[in-house]
């Protein structure tokens, strides 16, 4: 499966599934009109790092969400826009071939070195996922501006931003060390 360098921004979880069927990539959902502060911070970070591709439904709602994202992030040449070919179409209902064609037209295909990527076992070992891990996971998500999400989303975002195991260890050591008064 081909990999896209930029983060792809979509409206909902069904859109995310449709994109993931076609590409190995990081996808962020806006979850509709109400963009959370965490989502905006994550998009700003992605914009500095590798850029984003906005792919929303081709209806009025999709255009409003697209405009909101640009408003919050500002005009930037690292914001790429992908558009569906048919008016009033939802991303989730577009066939895989069209999704591939659209995203290949605006995205940057890449080949990441898989050996340097974190694994779920690394996060488990560090106490970021698994039993009694919620506090550590939230500290990591907040410090690295990764937004909320389950274990798989966290892992995907850590790898997207090339955050290393040593970075995680160091941050946990800092945040978990007793404070002096």
Curated annotation (Swiss-Prot):
Catalytic class of the enzyme: hydrolase
Residue ranges occupied by any Toprim domain in the UniProt entry: 5-88
Gene Ontology cellular-component terms listed: cytoplasm
Gene Ontology biological process: rRNA processing
SMART domains according to UniProt: TOPRIM
Transmembrane helix in keyword set: no
EC number: 3.1.26.8
Location (main, coarse): cytoplasm
Record: residues binding Mg(2+) 2: 57, 59
Needed cofactors: Mg(2+)
Co-factor binding details: Binds two Mg(2+) per subunit.
Compartments where located: Cytoplasm
GO MF terms, alphabetically ordered: metal ion binding; ribonuclease M5 activity; rRNA binding
Binding-site residues, Mg(2+) 1: 11, 57
Keyword set, alphabetical order: Cytoplasm, Endonuclease, Hydrolase, Magnesium, Metal-binding, Nuclease, Ribosome biogenesis, RNA-binding, rRNA processing, rRNA-binding
Keyword Cell division: no
Domain of life: Bacteria
One Pfam family here: Toprim
Catalytic reactions on record: Endonucleolytic cleavage of RNA, removing 21 and 42 nucleotides, respectively, from the 5'- and 3'-termini of a 5S-rRNA precursor
Record-linked PANTHER family: DNA PRIMASE (BACTERIAL TYPE) AND SMALL PRIMASE-LIKE PROTEINS, RIBONUCLEASE M5
Known role: Required for correct processing of both the 5' and 3' ends of 5S rRNA precursor. Cleaves both sides of a double-stranded region yielding mature 5S rRNA in one step.
Family the UniProt entry places it in: Belongs to the ribonuclease M5 family.
Protein name stated in the entry: Ribonuclease M5
Species per Swiss-Prot/TrEMBL record: Borreliella burgdorferi (strain ATCC 35210 / DSM 4680 / CIP 102532 / B31) (Borrelia burgdorferi)
Taxon lineage: Bacteria, Pseudomonadati, Spirochaetota, Spirochaetia, Spirochaetales
């Amino acid at each position: 499966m081909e990999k896209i360098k930029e983060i792809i921004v979509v409206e909902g979880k069904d859109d995310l599934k449709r994109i993931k069927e076609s590409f190995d990539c990081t996808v962020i959902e806006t979850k509709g009109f109400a963009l959370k502060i965490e989502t905006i911070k994550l998009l700003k970070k992605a914009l500095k790092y590798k850029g984003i591709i906005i792919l929303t439904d081709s209806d009025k709602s999709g255009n409003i969400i697209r405009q909101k994202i640009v408003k919050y992030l500002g005009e930037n040449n690292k914001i790429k826009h992908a558009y569906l070919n048919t008016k009033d179409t939802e991303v989730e209902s577009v066939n895989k071939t069209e999704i591939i064609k659209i995203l290949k037209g605006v995205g940057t295909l890449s080949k990441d070195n898989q050996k340097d990527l974190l694994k779920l076992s690394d996060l488990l070992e560090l106490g970021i996922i698994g039993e009694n891990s919620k506090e550590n996971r939230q500290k990591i998500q907040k410090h690295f501006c990764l937004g909320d999400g389950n274990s798989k989303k966290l892992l995907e975002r850590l790898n997207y931003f090339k955050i290393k195991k040593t970075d995680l260890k160091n941050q946990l050591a800092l945040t978990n060390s007793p404070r002096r008064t």
